[in-house]
Amino acid sequence: MSLAPHGGTLVNRVDESYDVSGIQKEIELDLISFADLELIGIGAYSPIEGFFNEKDYVSVVENMRLSSGVVWSLPITLPVDAQKAAELSLGETVKLTYEGETYGVIQIEDLYVPDKQKEAVNVYKTDEQEHPGVKKLFSRGNTYVGGPITLIKKASKQFPEFTFEPSETRRQFAEKGWETIVGFQTRNPVHRAHEYIQKTALETVDGLFLNPLVGETKSDDIPADVRMESYQVLLDHYYPKDRVFLGVFLAAMRYAGPREAIFHALVRKNYGCTHFIVGRDHAGVGDYYGTYEAQELFDTFKPEELGITPLKFEHSFFCKKCGNMGTAKTCPHGREHHVILSGTKVRGMLRDGVLPPAEFSRKEVVEVLIKGMKKKEEVGVS
């Protein structure tokens, strides 16, 4: 059986029969809070039951713990602008809308102005506007609304056949007889380095939960539909069907490096994972974080506080002399023999019309990516 959810209980804040006809006020969500609303509602963010009040916000920003003491690394907030904040009052129940449709309600228990400078430095380790997470933070409203939510409608899904709630993945893992499940988070197509890490992990557990993020990402990331097709073709040709489960993760990417790695692990724990792969520069961007800083952050918590086991991997590469994949732990040869693989490199090659070599990526995956990049250019998406 899967481990207990984070905090002990899988949160369920869904009530699709909730009557909002008497509620006049509303808050229009952006893409981040729209995704967060559903993820809170279905229990992916257990034990969180709503957008953070000031007490939880300050505690997480400063100590990576909720005010209850439970480990949580990223603030889950609902920002509004000053004009909207002036309309709201404590104790009110307000509709949460996206593109004019109501998806939930929030019972307002807190309205507060955050110290965004401190949030940026603590969460992202920088206040530079060039950092996509910091840029997004400062572009959002300057008042945060806190309180428990009720999810009354789920968004229509881009990938319905690969969209699962934590209660569903837990049931599926149990039906497969998996007792140990390793989660893998990615926003890139799976290249050979990822494949090597996943299969190495799979040697030690019952199942692999490949859980690509399909929420908001940077504009130069490969589109989600292209990535999903690349995952499917890879799994069909190179993975044992009865040992892998593919499902999407709806959250937006924060690019918060080490803190986001902890967040990714805790969420996968709620989906039923017992282990989580933490590679090099997990959830990083540019040169803001050390190569293995995310792995080191896991070591600052007691294992029972996290309740999910990190599987830490060094950067893997293809060694021409060995003739296969390896890491510094398994390969004795110098860097001149290594083909260093990365999602950034693969993206750059594809953009330049260069075919990545077989050591980089499987042929079937490359074909899907090239087709997808061409389509992206044709429709003029930047």
Curated annotation (Swiss-Prot):
InterPro entries: ATP-Sase_PUA-like_dom, PUA-like_sf, Rossmann-like_a/b/a_fold, SO4_adenylyltransferase_pro, Sulfurylase_cat_dom, Sulphate_adenylyltransferase. It catalyses: sulfate + ATP + H(+) = adenosine 5'-phosphosulfate + diphosphate. CDD domains: ATPS (cd00517). Induction: Up-regulated by sulfur starvation and repressed by cysteine. Also induced by O-acetyl-L-serine (OAS), a direct precursor of cysteine, maybe via inactivation of a putative transcriptional repressor of the cysH operon whose activity is controlled by the intracellular levels of OAS. Belongs to the sulfate adenylyltransferase family. HAMAP family: Sulf_adenylyltr. GO terms for biological process: hydrogen sulfide biosynthetic process; sulfate assimilation. Gene3D superfamilies: HUPs (3.40.50.620), Sulfate adenylyltransferase (3.10.400.10). NCBIfam families: PRK04149.1, sopT. One of its GO terms (molecular function) is sulfate adenylyltransferase (ATP) activity. Pathway: Sulfur metabolism; hydrogen sulfide biosynthesis; sulfite from sulfate: step 1/3. Keywords: ATP-binding, Nucleotide-binding, Nucleotidyltransferase, Transferase. SUPFAM superfamilies: Nucleotidylyl transferase, PUA domain-like. Its EC number is 2.7.7.4. It comes from Bacillus subtilis (strain 168). It is an enzyme of class 2 (transferase). This is Sulfate adenylyltransferase.
